[in-house]
Amino acid sequence: MFKDRENKRFIKIFKEGSLTESIQILLDTETGVNYIHLNAGYGISLTPLLDSDGKVVVSSEREIQNYIDRN
């Protein structure tokens, strides 16, 4: 359904885990906000990624373009 879209709003910039448990960092290419996506069994969580000061991690336009170029 969404794989045919040329300009994806969310791109995966990190993934680690196994078949049943995983952690991913997703980047919203429109806002620059980074999200952490946890998947464990039947449970799923999606929340903004926070830095050490508790502020939302926002990628710069340059970082976003670098990630888009890699994918």
What are the residue ranges of the model-derived segments?
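Motif-centric detector for short Cys/His coordination patterns
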Residues: 2-23, 29-30, 37-71
